[in-house]
Amino acid sequence: SLAALKELDTGNGQQIPTLAEVFESIGQDLFINVELTNYTTKDDNLVEKVVEVVKEYKQEENILFSSFLPKNLKRAAKLLPEVPRGLLTLNNFGGWLLRSFLFGFGNYQALHPNWKNTNQFNVKRVRCMGRRVYSWTVNDPDQMRQLADWGIDGIITDDPALATKVLRTN
């Protein structure tokens, strides 16, 4: 429940924010990746509930939806077609299949490979398709620089302050 999550400490007394709290705090200042992945309850109303919050806070131009589940991205496209969507891919055979072949047939504006599966060739290939590449989860400064040198559009990180510092100097 939300109440139980609010009791957790994520470090330094910080609590897990709701999406509404994130939008209230930094919604107009940053471009935010909103992940729509629900592994155990794939047929719940996650997408619809997130779309409601996005509309309420008028964040359509400030976000990107991403998910490992193409079905969720398809649902998001029907509800908010103007919001770009990125397909997340795992570091396994299924992820390779999605990255290599199936991605080209989906209605996605971006590919989100694990940083271990990101290389200069794949970045160029996806960019030639007119789509963007955002790699996850990149927390190492050297890896951030390498990805930037390859022309990646952005990174998904646990440390936005570090990424901002590294990418501004690159």
Question: Where do the PLM segments sit?
Answer:
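Metal-dependent phosphodiesterase/phospholipase catalytic core, i.e.
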Residues: S1-L90, G106-Q109, P113-W115, R127-M129
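C-terminal active-site rim and adjoining tail of enzyme catalytic domains
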Residues: G11-Q14, E21, L87-N170
